[in-house]
């Protein structure tokens, strides 16, 4: 403490001596910043205001926000900020004019940093003359924060502030689940708790009684011990610090009798007790209010009070005697310490003076010498700058002649920087700045022209083997110069040149392939400016060769663009090595992002995304929300940030341009209807395979970063071509089967060996394929069938047969059913070749099957059946024709129904798992076919039943055996049987006639019963028996009905 006092005195005296050299400071200054580390000292309010504006202020638009406060928030300013004028008023009112603690305002300006730091750490207290070191004590409250400052913290998000009180505990601060009871605590009964309360209650009562008695005894002992020590039992009028007898009211209160005895000033004390009660003499004397008191009694009373006070003072003096003498004895020692302290101070001052002479003065001289050296060095640097600026223009011209654009630009920028900072105002260089700027702009135009010529030369000539970019060094120099000048228009030039380069590569390849394919070019322009029609006249193999060649060349062109892209990225890193983004870059970036969001919606949603197929190239949900490379490069580049964003997309942009050109090539050939009709699914699948292979190569190179394969132009074009082909394929087959049904005569047709081989191949392999594809394996010999047996002809005969054999079962059918099988084979082949469009094929196959079924049933069972075969009414003559037509229709539907499962299996192999539910339509169609076949069988039975019923209605039991009616019935039955034989299988004919026989039995029993013929009528019943036996004999004679079990007449009548 003693050393601190000595240092304090010395520092204060030193600072006082130097304060006379400074100007008069403002009131409350100098002062320090309360929130900056290390500490900064300000001599005036203007300096503090400037500091607050620079370091504790943020600007948002035209508003200023004050950050001079805890946690960077000033609680005296609105959060939304104020204008500039109001902000200046706020600083003056709330920060620069506030009174500050003495510890910060008493630190004087000094050049000695150590002394200034010491003075700022010393505080002179108001109750002591000795200085003390102010230390900030660390307590629990050091962790507290201002709640309003925390809620107004601009670094927190609005969501954090809105959920500040509820994000941890919820809205109610109440636990949602009750706390379970502990298993370690035993459950206590109410009786046990009652006994505890009684025992504890008695103890607590005894404790309270003892505590109360102790407090009372302590109070009484205190009062008795201090009774003579306190002044509370003395009249208050004598202990009042303002007591004076010169005051009339005080004089009257002491020497006169009061009007009310209770208001006597000599009896009023603080404690209510009087140390000197009234004497009996004073009580006996009766005086009127306002008269003087009795002199003798008053004198005695005052003397007694004096004695009491004198005794009490003497007691206190006796009690303080030891302390008093201790102070007296220590005074001499204190004087010695003060003398020693003065000697030490004198020694310290003498030493400090000696140090000042030896060290400080020498240091000042060294500093002055160093300052002079720095000034001269700075002057020499400026002279060197002047010398360099004199040669600036000639140096730039020399660098331009050498083609070193980056160094020339750097020289100009350095010269302009020196002119604006170091040599600002030099008269001899007043025109140099404008001359350099003009030269700067000229260099920019020159570099743009050089870049355009270099790119055109690069894209116009195919590079040598092993190299992708020929003029790499020249391009790097020009690009580095353009990027340092921040002239980004070369991106637009590069974009246009890429588009033209893709076009020229494609045209060159197509012309070469047209000349090599041998297409007749006599009808075309020799220059081949229009390539659409020659491409359409090319053969399919030549066209696929052309497409592959175009894709290979475009892929190589994109690889060259990728090499150019690497050069651009490397140059951009050299030109702008830092990642700084100014406010202007951020604003431009946001504007460009807004443009991108509008252009994406138009660019990505095209007319090609119409496929309902889940496996197609484009689906409805495949629209990419991000901007594509084409969209990004179509925007003008005005910032370094956006340049770095588009540079990695150069190769992808070229790839997207190539996709568009290849898509136009594919669509140009598809515009010719004859070419589309002649295209087979195999040919189309080969084209799709080539496209997918090209897309896979490009995806491996990373050229689908902003746009996937399905959303790309090439994918959409292939999808459109495939969907158009499917529509035309389906329309042609639908029209073909419709024309066949319209012209169908419903007569048995001959089956060619080609169709029979197609069916045999389908039964053998389980896959229905067109007859054109049965040439992959060994050549099959044609079948030659006779009846139900089949033999293989050793020759190459192309003779036809009356029925088609399916799994050892003969089908005699009409020509439209054979055509339908051929069409189904075409569909199966198309499904296997184009599996990604299985969903679209599925819907069209189902539609075709339903159309064939409905048209057949409409023509056979509907109102158009008679007109179709040229009949007006159904009579006995044309009954056989109608019967045969119905039979042929049923067998035709059965034949088509046999091949529906094969189509189902073909579709099952290619449909994805999430689309397997579409196969249920095949089961529905197959069920419809079987229902219609059953309806035809019922129709046949109803026709036979109708004629037998009519004959039985005309039957009369007479003596003619057999009767004419039964002869007619048997004749028609035989005719029906012969009509079915050769068309329907024997088992089906037998089943049909079994149902006819059941109907005949019911009609016969009903008719005989109606005529009243009974077995006891021997004659008539015998005639009936003879007719029925004739019927049995004729039925048994039919080849297909020999196994029928025919009952006797008695069994029919009495069963």
Swiss-Prot record:
Q: Which gene encodes it?
A: vps-54
**Key word Transport present in the record?**
yes
Molecular function via GO: syntaxin binding
InterPro entries noted in UniProt: Vps54, Vps54_C, VPS54_N
Q: Where is this region: Disordered?
A: 774-794
What is the protein's known function? Answer: Acts as a component of the GARP complex that is involved in retrograde transport from early and late endosomes to the trans-Golgi network (TGN). The GARP complex facilitates tethering as well as SNARE complex assembly at the Golgi.
Tagged with keyword Transport: yes
* Protein name, as recorded: Vacuolar protein sorting-associated protein 54
